[in-house]
């Protein structure tokens, strides 16, 4: 009942229906804008394994710890997901940004160069704090609240990269 209530609440404000996602799926963005999105998104994704590891460290349930450890190893590229070759998730973003015309260094140095949006910094801060909350709160916020949105978002935003933006399968 708790998880369903949480999922229902997420659905009301799901990232897949955010105006940015709508602009993306309708083909209204250019490659530079997509690269700027990567610049922001990278600085969330590149820390996600750390935050999940903190939840793992505070988890009292061995079966959930196993799930969390699998999540960390997938994020960090030690194991592949769904039969795919292992690759660090943040590296996928860097490769996509390069495909969009942005240099890796620009993304990697965005935080120290003061180029992250307040919203990105706020999300980083919230995730860091959330990861050290009691286990149920941390798990609910980070994995159910945030990460569970990813499949729906990417299933909506990936096809337009091929169909409207002219990316190849390899680039995507």
Predicted regions and their residues:
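Acidic, low-complexity proline/glycine-rich segments
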Residues: 1-21, 115-119
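Alpha-helical bundle segments that constitute or directly flank the non-heme di-iron/ferroxidase center
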Residues: 9-14, 24, 28-60, 78, ...
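Helix N-cap / loop-to-helix initiation motif
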Residues: 30, 60-61, 103, 168
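Short, solvent-exposed secondary-structure capping/transition elements
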Residues: 47-50, 64, 105-106
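His/Met- and acidic-residue-enriched segments that coordinate or traffic transition-metal cofactors
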Residues: 21-22, 94
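Active-site-proximal alpha-helical scaffolds that flank and shape metal-associated catalytic sites
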Residues: 2-3, 66-172
């Amino acid at each position: 009942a708790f998880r369903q209530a949480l999922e229902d609440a997420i659905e009301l404000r799901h990232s897949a229906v955010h105006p940015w996602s709508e602009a993306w799926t309708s083909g209204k963005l250019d490659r530079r804008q997509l690269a700027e999105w990567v610049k922001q998104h990278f600085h969330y994704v590149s820390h996600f394994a750390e935050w999940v590891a903190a939840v793992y460290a505070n988890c009292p349930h061995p079966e959930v710890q196993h799930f969390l450890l699998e999540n960390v190893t997938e994020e960090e590229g030690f194991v592949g997901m769904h039969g795919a070759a292992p690759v660090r998730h943040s590296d996928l973003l860097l490769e996509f940004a390069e495909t969009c015309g942005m240099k890796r260094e620009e993304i990697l140095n965005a935080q120290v160069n003061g180029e992250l949006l307040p919203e990105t910094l706020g999300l980083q801060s919230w995730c860091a704090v959330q990861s050290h909350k009691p286990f149920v709160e941390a798990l609910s916020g980070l994995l159910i609240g945030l990460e569970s949105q990813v499949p729906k978002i990417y299933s909506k935003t990936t096809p337009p990269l091929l169909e409207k933006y002219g990316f190849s399968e390899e680039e995507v």
